[in-house]
Amino acid sequence: MNFIYQKKSPKTKEIEQLAKTQNIKIIRINTNELDKILKNKDHRGFALKLKLEKNKNVKTQTKDFENLLETFKKKENAFILLLDEIEDPQNFGAILRTAEQFSIDLVITTQKRSAKDNSTVLRTSSGASQYVKKMTVTNINNTINLLKNYGFWIYTGDIKGQDINKIKINDKKIALILGNEGKGVHKLIKENSDFLIRIPTSGKIDSLNVSVSTGILIFEIKRQLNLL
């Protein structure tokens, strides 16, 4: 891991001291070199180079998931977020940032047609992607069935769903599903859900950005459960 910076400032001095305590190598380079490394992205004069942890294979993750579900049996409340083919890494990063702030227990993504952990996700999430527990599955419907066996109720965001303000949520184990930026949630997943919910809006366009919707739905569900 390397801490790379362009010029000294009170902020870089503070970060440099922190880097030293963590035995992180410090490298000073000029502006052009930093622009080239970061492909001219807004870097505020410094950067951290690190290696992202590789995802476990799906088979290993499935076993970990089952073990995790066993631990949820001992918890009074649990909240899992499932993302059905969220493809934009900036949306994924923003969702992970929200998930971290609201202490979501697990974020599940699909193996295919989903954004992967990368530098864009890390940056958009402001580092939250490194704190959120995540796993990948091949089939969300199979995952839903497993969650139901462990007492989870499935809530899915859908434009034709019930107004979330007009339903009473009192389930202790919640799984919230959000869908692809363009297509939304797959039909079979909606059919396998316990509730379809929507956010009431009054604008001229018909939907919110998926990362915004995620934050609003998580907040409202947690508010109703007195978990804020």
Curated annotation (Swiss-Prot):
Q: Which InterPro entries match?
A: Alpha/beta_knot_MTases (IPR029028), Ribosomal_eL30-like_sf (IPR029064), rRNA_MeTrfase_TrmH (IPR004441), SpoU_MeTrfase (IPR001537), SpoU_subst-bd (IPR013123), tRNA_m1G_MTases_N (IPR029026)
Instruction: Give one GO biological process term.
Output: RNA processing
Tell me the Gene3D superfamilies matching this sequence. Answer: 3.30.1330.30, 3.40.1280.10
Checking SUPFAM superfamilies in the record gives: alpha/beta knot
Pfam families membership: SpoU_methylase, SpoU_sub_bind
Keyword Transferase in record: yes
The GO molecular function terms of this record are:
RNA binding; RNA methyltransferase activity
Keyword check for Methyltransferase = yes
Cellular component aspect of the GO annotation:
cytosol
Cite the EC number.
2.1.1.-
Keywords annotated in UniProt:
Methyltransferase, Transferase
Q: Where does S-adenosyl-L-methionine bind?
A: G179, I199, L208
Q: Check the record and name the NCBIfam families matching this protein.
A: rRNA_methyl_3 (TIGR00186)
Protein family (similarity comment): Belongs to the class IV-like SAM-binding methyltransferase superfamily. RNA methyltransferase TrmH family.
| Protein name listed in UniProt | Uncharacterized tRNA/rRNA methyltransferase BB_0516
